Amino acid sequence: MDTATKTGYADVLVGLQYGDEGKARVVDHLAAGYDVIARFNGGANAGHTIATSEGILRLRQVPSGVLHPRVSLYIGSGCVIGLRQLASEIEMLAGQGIDLAGRLTISDRCPVVQPAHFLSDRRDGGRIGTTGNGIGPCYADLAARMRGGERSAFQLCDLMRDESRVFEQMMRLAAQRDDEDIAVLIQEMRQAWQVVRPFVTDNPVALLERVEGGARVLFEGAQSVMLDVVQGAQPWVTSSHTLPSYAYVGGDLPCRYHRKTIGVAKAMVSRVGSGPLPTELGAERSEAYCADAGREGRGRADEAARFDPRALLAQGDAFSTGIAIRMLSNEYGTGTGRPRRVGLLDVAQLQLAIRQFGVDEVYLNKCDSLAVFAQTRDRCIPVVVGSRDGNAMHVMRFPAFDESVIPRDDATPLPPQLETLLEWLADVLGRPLRGIGLGPQRAQMRLFKTQP
């Protein structure tokens, strides 16, 4: 990494909708301009995907700058650590020739997900659509501090001091909640800890020292602002703070170094699990269908076997259109494989998020998915711009474009229909569009120096 002589800075990147906006691919494109990519919230419930020419790289806890060998990676104290998942991820990356030694640093203040947390989440989390990775119970025990006269939460620093005592206490806590044999889980965690331990630091100003030396940091948010534990719609939220301002608490850096906030959205809204999705295609019917599919373990393969997306589009009803869009744009959860509920782009929601959370610029992924509407009866792209009376949605319609005119390289101009839509969107959002996604591959991201 280049050695800078002046004080560095930090930017924060967050999702502006309900998750799965393609934040990782934007981080991957921006990473070369930073010295450190840092995570500040969440844990193994985050599914970040980077599509490369060699295949798909799926990450849950390691920051998305892994493909840039000169970039350091940091997991801040606001994240919870699933030892088994993180160790598996580190080993998976090593198997692909990506060595994290000397690159990855983890705060020793990160809480550890315990067997009791997995068991609790899998028993109680299904109704609100959690991933079952124990994230919520881990954060809850961190806040509770004590249960039954004993500590209820442990951080990596506790393992550093006395791992045997901590694992023994974790076993006792789990045994109080479930009859399942916990010994196997504890043994797997002991083994995973040996993989994770070399990356843990007890230096609370590790990231600050880098920035004081000139390092440029990009904080990578997990989940999205609409799922924030406070600002989101309870109880259908994640269990951590997802907002840009929290990056400096969970990322272990004073906020004085903040430079700008980057928001990522996508041209079709989607959501995994239960909770409000005002523009959902198929409304309650779609929500119930996706909930049943999640409980029964049905996803991409099941829908591919049952449905022809083009036939669904020809039917013309919102529910069928939603299934078709999900199939054609691969809207299935990265971390879970569950079908995502699909809705129209909600411009009013984006406007509020941008204003409320201080977003300076926007990236819009999945613009290629809008070509689906060329196969609908009216051949128009519907965009929700608000409600007239609190109930009926006000929808604007833009001419659709065919999939065949989507550019495959930067030299090919955008379809005029898409260009018109993007210019309008940048104007109503009041923020510059810095880039758009035109397909899943790394090369299918187009960056703008000026407005499209």
Curated annotation (Swiss-Prot):
Active-site residues, as the UniProt record annotates them: 20 (proton acceptor), 48 (proton donor)
Pathway assigned in UniProt: Purine metabolism; AMP biosynthesis via de novo pathway; AMP from IMP: step 1/2
Residues annotated to bind GTP: 19-25, 47-49, 340, 366-368, 437-439
Quaternary context: Homodimer.
UniProt source species: Cupriavidus pinatubonensis (strain JMP 134 / LMG 1197)
Cofactor stoichiometry and binding remark: Binds 1 Mg(2+) ion per subunit.
Catalysed conversion reaction: IMP + L-aspartate + GTP = N(6)-(1,2-dicarboxyethyl)-AMP + GDP + phosphate + 2 H(+)
Keywords, ordered alphabetically: Cytoplasm, GTP-binding, Ligase, Magnesium, Metal-binding, Nucleotide-binding, Purine biosynthesis
Residues that hold substrate according to the record: 334-340
Gene Ontology terms describing biological process: 'de novo' AMP biosynthetic process; IMP metabolic process
Disulfide pattern: none
Enzyme Commission number: 6.3.4.4
Name under which the protein is recorded: Adenylosuccinate synthetase 2
